[in-house]
Structures are given as structure tokens and as C-alpha cells.
């Protein structure tokens, strides 16, 4: 799952004006002082269609509108939600999910197994063009259907046996398949709603959901409003109304929080220089995340088609300096799988070594940076991304003699650029979609649409496929270690920079908010304190 953010000044002023009007007018929501619970998304969600969404902002909205077969507990193990139980059969090659009888959609209709079958086949349908279709490729004939090798979706190994029973047939035992059921792309969808409204099915007047909140309104580029679902089968949320603002400027978002006009901020709304002050405040936390930041190289473009150049740029970065700039609990990283996840290994990766970096660059034909072409590092518009980019720009100039041009882009434009024509160097990040190393390692598979470097390595692909089939953890770790060495030491299409923690602050008049290690903002247990 990718992480942003960015927006224009005029929208910022409009959002601020809207907030001031709402503060003066809205007193009927049942939360503290009758106000809605207000959070800042920071930007417009690119999509609320969970077959198409790819980013942190979109998934944080969807996670409060929808639930799926499972969610993960505090130990990152899948636990039933719409599924009341499941059976793992045929040595792990067949899984049968048994659904609850009381799970309903917001229009009162029962959630049935066919809603999952439709959703998963829509995710795989090549016409949908989902970037996350590959997550289901372990299902029999799923990849073949997605690639157009078969056209009959009845041949795909997922089927509703009846309203309460969903059968999944896998090509082979798959170690991460149950954790995958916590990921929003596997959540059910209503065929009648999607087919009736087409691309507009996620608009407030059309969408039907099954989670704790309903989509009340969506003023694009401005705000999203949610209201409690009174018929949510796990119980109505304590707060009646939620407002999700889209204030891009960190300083403005923090000012609104200080004035009581926002109730929760995360990293994307907290200026770095304000973190020491806020750390003394009630409600401030650093929440460890299963998330990493990296710089990627367009390996099909000169000069980064030369692995020596990629290694030189990697070894010229002093990652240990970056956490002191960001002040948010970050941890420098040379490997890709994050701390807290199976197969994390801090010993993997290229160390900071300027003399070796200069030697490699000289060997590649650019002694002391002479003759090196003008290249650009692109990043999405956000304060912390700029600070890191400027720091690393200085390291490359100092250690390699190369001045890299910086370019910042608004989030939607940046994502489109990565997909269509990646810059020579680009910033990106990844947060866990489901709590398994497969989710991190598979990002750079040759078939992954989010492999923006366009790098391919057949041995790497083989290793991640073997690890997915392996059910013994120690053997999985060895396979992932070898894959990480190829990624971070041998071919180096990316440079891991740091693993993140999320700086958050919650209005102390509220309790129950959950911001978990998967980067999800969970609001269904939020309530106003009574004292």
C-alpha cells in the first residue's frame, strides 16, 4: 500500500473556511460537545472502490465503511469477522469459509458468499485493471483469468457453494492466504450495485456497505462525512458522525487541532519541528508501523541501467542521519522486510561507504561524478519527503560529486507518473496490506504493477513463490533472506531508507481510537469521555 500526500492553496483556504462554518453550526452528532469526530485525511482519496484503491488514504476510509471475512488481532493473527469459522482441507489446497448469518449490508440485505465470489472475480477481471489482482494469483486459474488465457470466470477456483459457504481452491498450500483475508481488496461487493452504477457506484447516493459507518457525503477535494451504521452487526459505533477533512498543509492542520477543530492527526498532518512540543501533550504517541520508505531507480533508463551506479548511489546515503531529521521514531534500514515481521534481518543490505561508492562510480565511467548526466529525484509533495530528499541530494553531491535535480509532485500526479513513466530516481513507501512478509517481497516481483523500477530477476521470483508455498517458518525465513539479498545487495533496484513509526495525537476528550501497525485508522470504538 503506497503512502502520499499533496493539494493546492486555494483548496486549503476553502477547507479551512468550511471547518469554521461547521464548528459554528453542527452540534447534533452525539460526540464531545455535540460535534462530529474530525480527522484529517490530508488529500482526496484517489478511489473508494476497494478493487481499485492502492493507497493509504483510500484504505483508511474504506476500512471504516467495510469489513471482510477476517481482521487481525493484536498479535497480527487473522480472526473471524464475517466468517464465523473456516476449514483448511486437502493439505492446505482448499479452504472453506463459513459465514455468519447476521452480517448485513446497509440496505438490510444479508451478506452472502456470492458477494465475495463476485468481488474477487471482479478484482481478477482484466477489464477492472486492478493493481492488486496479483494478490489472488494463488487461487486456481486466477492468474490465467487475469491474463486473458481463460475467459470463463467459472474456471477460477472460488465459488459460493450456498449463501453461507465460500470455497477457495489453491494451486498449492499458501502460507499467507488467511492473513490476506484481512486486506480490503478481498472484501465483498454487491453485484447489483456495481453493475447498476458503473464507475459511480462508490458515490454516497449509490454505495452499499457493511461496516460500522456509512458514507454520508463526499465533497470531492474538500471533505468526506461518515455516519454511524445503526444496523452494524457487531454493534453501532459510539460516535454518530465523522468528518474527514482534506487539509494538505501541516501547519494549518495542526492549527485546527490546537483550536479544537480537528480531533486526530497523524504523521501527514504534524510538522516535524512541532513533534518535540507535541510529545509532551496528552494523547501524543509514536505507533510502530510495518512500513518502509525507499528510493527506487528506473533500471531500464541510463545511467541506472548500470548496477554499479545503483550501488554507488545506495552506498553514498548515510541512512543513520535520517531519523534525527524526521523525529518521529523512524529506524534506519538497509533491508526491506520491516522490524516486527517474520524474516526481518538488519544485517542484509549495503552499508554507508563513500570510498566504495566513489570507486564504483569511477568504474562505471564517472570519476568524481564527471560526465554524469542530469538526473531527477521525484517525490510527492510533503514536508518530510522534501527534507529527506534535500538531505540525500546533499550526500550525493558531497560523496559522489553528482548534483541531482529535485522535483515534487502532487500525490495523484505522482502516482500516475510512477505507473506510466517512472523518473530516474523516485521516492516511494510501502505499508503492510496484510501482516506477512509476502506482502513486502512480492512488491518487486516481475509481475507486480507496483514494481515501478521495472526490475526483473527470475531467481527472485522463484524464491518468493517457494516461500509462499513453504509452511515451515524457518525455511520461509531462509528463502526471504536470499530474496532480500538479491534485492538490496546484488541488483539494487531500490535503496531502503528507514522504517517508520506513526506520530499521532488524539484529542484527550476521546478514547478508543486505534491506529494499528498496519497503518489503519479504526474509528468504530471511539467514544467521548464522560467526565
Which residues fall in each region the model found?
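Short helix-initiation/N-cap motifs at beta->coil->alpha
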Residues: 243-255, 270-271, 406-416
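Local pocket/hinge segments that shape ligand/substrate recognition
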Residues: 42, 129, 133, 264-354, ...
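C-terminal motif of bacterial Sec signal peptides marking the signal peptidase cleavage site
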Residues: 23-24
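Detector for C-terminal structural segments
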Residues: 219, 316-345, 383-393, 415-531
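N-terminal lobe/hinge region of extracytoplasmic solute-binding protein
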Residues: 40-90, 206-209
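A structural "hinge/loop" feature
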Residues: 43-60, 82-83, 109, 131, ...
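Gly/Pro-rich hinge or "lid" segments in bacterial periplasmic/extracellular proteins
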Residues: 142, 153-159, 163-164, 170-237, ...
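Aromatic- and charge-enriched surface segment that lines or borders ligand/interaction sites
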Residues: 85-135, 167, 256, 303
Amino acid at each position: 500500500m503506497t503512502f502520499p500526500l499533496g493539494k493546492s492553496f486555494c483548496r486549503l483556504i476553502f477547507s479551512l473556511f468550511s471547518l469554521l462554518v461547521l464548528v459554528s453550526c453542527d452540534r447534533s452528532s452525539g460526540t464531545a460537545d455535540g460535534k462530529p469526530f474530525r480527522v484529517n485525511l490530508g488529500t482526496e482519496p484517489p478511489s473508494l472502490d476497494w478493487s481499485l484503491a492502492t493507497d493509504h488514504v483510500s484504505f483508511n476510509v474504506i476500512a471504516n465503511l467495510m469489513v471482510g471475512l477476517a481482521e487481525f488481532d493484536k498479535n497480527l493473527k487473522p480472526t473471524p469477522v464475517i466468517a464465523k469459522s473456516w476449514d483448511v482441507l486437502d493439505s492446505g489446497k482448499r479452504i472453506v469459509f463459513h459465514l455468519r448469518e447476521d452480517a448485513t449490508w446497509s440496505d438490510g440485505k444479508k451478506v452472502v458468499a456470492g458477494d465475495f465470489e463476485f468481488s474477487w472475480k471482479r478484482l481478477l477481471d482484466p477489464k477492472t485493471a486492478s493493481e492488486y489482482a496479483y494478490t489472488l494469483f494463488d487461487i486456481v486459474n486466477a492468474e490465467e483469468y487475469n491474463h486473458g488465457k481463460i475467459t470463463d470466470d467459472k474456471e477460477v477456483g472460488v465459488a459460493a457453494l450456498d449463501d453461507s459457504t465460500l470455497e477457495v481452491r489453491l494451486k498449492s498450500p499458501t502460507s499467507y492466504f488467511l492473513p490476506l483475508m484481512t486486506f480490503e481488496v478481498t472484501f465483498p461487493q454487491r453485484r447489483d450495485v456495481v453493475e447498476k452504477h458503473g464507475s459511480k457506484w462508490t458515490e454516497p447516493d449509490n454505495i452499499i456497505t457493511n461496516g460500522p459507518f456509512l458514507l454520508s457525503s463526499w465533497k470531492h477535494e474538500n471533505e468526506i462525512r461518515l455516519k454511524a451504521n445503526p444496523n452494524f452487526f457487531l454493534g453501532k459505533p459510539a460516535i454518530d458522525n465523522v468528518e474527514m477533512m482534506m487539509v494538505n498543509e501541516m501547519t494549518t492542520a495542526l492549527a485546527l487541532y490546537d483550536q479544537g477543530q480537528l480531533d486526530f492527526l497523524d504523521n501527514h498532518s504534524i510538522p516535524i519541528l512541532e513533534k518535540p512540543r507535541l510529545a509532551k501533550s496528552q494523547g501524543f504517541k509514536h505507533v510502530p508501523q510495518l512500513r518502509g520508505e525507499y528510493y527506487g531507480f528506473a533500471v531500464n533508463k541510463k545511467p541506472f541501467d548500470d548496477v554499479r551506479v545503483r550501488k554507488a548511489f545506495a552506498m553514498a546515503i548515510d541512512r543513520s542521519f535520517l531519523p534525527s531529521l524526521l523525529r518521529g521514531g523512524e529506524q534506519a534500514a538497509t533491508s526491506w522486510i520491516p522490524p516486527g515481521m517474520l524474516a526481518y534481518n538488519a544485517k542484509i543490505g549495503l552499508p554507508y561507504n563513500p570510498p566504495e561508492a566513489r570507486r564504483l562510480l569511477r568504474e562505471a565511467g564517472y570519476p568524481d561524478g564527471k560526465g554524469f548526466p542530469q538526473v531527477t529525484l521525484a517525490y510527492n509533495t510533503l514536508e518530510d519527503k522534501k527534507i529527506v530528499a534535500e538531505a540525500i541530494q546533499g550526500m550525493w553531491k558531497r560523496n559522489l560529486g553528482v548534483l541531482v535535480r529535485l522535483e515534487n509532485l502532487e500525490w495523484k500526479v505522482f502516482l500516475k507518473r510512477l505507473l506510466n513513466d517512472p523518473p530516474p530516481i523516485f521516492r516511494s513507501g510501502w505499508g503492510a496490506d496484510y501482516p506477512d512478509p509476502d506482502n513486502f517481497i512480492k512488491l518487486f516481483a516481475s509481475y507486480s504493477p507496483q514494481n515501478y523500477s521495472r526490475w526483473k530477476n527470475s531467481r527472485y521470483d522463484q524464491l518468493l513463490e517457494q516461500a509462499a508455498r513453504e509452511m515451515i517458518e524457518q525455511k520461509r525465513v531462509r528463502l526471504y533472506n536470499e530474496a532480500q539479498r538479491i534485492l538490496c545487495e546484488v541488483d539494487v533496484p531500490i535503496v531502503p531508507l528507514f522504517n517508520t513509526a506513526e506520530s499521532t495525537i488524539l484529542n484527550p476528550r476521546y478514547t478508543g481510537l486505534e491506529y494499528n501497525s498496519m497503518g489503519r485508522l479504526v474509528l468504530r470504538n471511539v467514544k467521548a469521555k464522560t467526565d
